[in-house]
Design a protein with these regions (language model features):
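Intrinsically disordered, low-complexity terminal regions
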Residues: 1-262
């Protein structure tokens, strides 16, 4: 039996949806197998990323590439400008969708900055099977859910404009999204710290009954509940000095203890 910690973050923030008229479409299926590594990185922009652990020794990748464009000229431009880069460095295999929308910032970040519409959209939908023990860093921005299932390695998952679902894992890590929900189900309780965040969504985390952990919560316009037996912990308020007085703020946070964490 699993126990559930549910945190509902119901912040009412506005979102904008833009649609464009695409008259041209072209599809391609990319299939590749790779030797197992310790770590997998998938950095997508448009599309979903689904990763499943299995008992094999290879990384099996299937990517469905879809180009939608306003004209044949823009479709040809998309073929030239947007590429799937695959690199293996040390113990890490990386799939990276590159194009004019990438920042290539001076501080080394590779963010997404679409300041103007290029007249096309290139979607990569990833399905991967990986050896169970691999760790995973997965991210996407538009139009796709991130799913991670059946792995024992650690994880770092990031999404925008969709949800993240993690099932039957026993690693630890970070899960965060905007405009989407977070659902995490552990097959074995994590042995290291975990962080789950969302804006405009809910968080549902399910653990094994023998969980021992200190849980820290922070929500804006939301509520939380758990079916674990829990003991409230004191929350340290932040303080600032203003006009000769100390002002204390709790930042809508709370904390409680489950079991007997060391």
């Amino acid at each position: 039996m699993k126990r559930v910690l549910l945190l509902v973050c119901a912040a009412a923030l506005g979102s904008t949806s833009l649609s464009y008229g695409f008259d041209q479409e072209e599809k391609e299926t990319i299939r590749r197998n790779f030797p197992a590594t310790v770590r997998l990185e998938v950095d997508d922009v448009h599309g979903f990323v689904h990763v499943t652990g299995y008992s094999g020794t290879e990384i099996q990748m299937v990517a469905e590439k879809t180009i939608r464009a306003e004209s044949q000229e823009r479709l040809d431009a998309a073929k030239r400008e947007v590429k799937l880069d695959t690199t293996q460095s040390g113990d890490t295999l990386t799939f990276y969708v590159d194009g004019p929308f990438r920042c290539h910032c001076d501080d080394g970040r590779f963010g997404v900055h679409e300041h103007s519409h290029p007249g096309y959209r290139v979607i990569y939908d990833f399905e991967l099977k990986v050896p169970t023990g691999m760790s995973a860093e997965l991210s996407t921005v538009n139009g796709g859910k991130i799913e991670l299932r059946g792995t024992t390695g650690d994880f770092d998952l990031s999404n925008v404009n969709s949800s993240i679902e993690v099932e039957e894992v026993s690693g630890a890590g970070k899960v965060q999204t905007v405009n989407g929900g977070v659902k995490v189900v552990f097959a074995g309780n994590p042995r290291k710290n975990c962080t789950f965040k969302t804006v405009n969504g809910g968080i549902e985390a399910s653990f094994r009954p023998n969980l021992s952990a200190d849980v820290h919560l922070k929500t804006f316009n939301g509520s939380a509940y758990t079916d674990f037996d829990a003991t409230a912990l004191p929350v340290t308020a932040s303080a600032e000095r203003r006009d000769g007085k100390f002002i204390y703020r709790s930042n809508r946070s709370s904390a409680f203890r489950i079991g007997n964490p060391r």
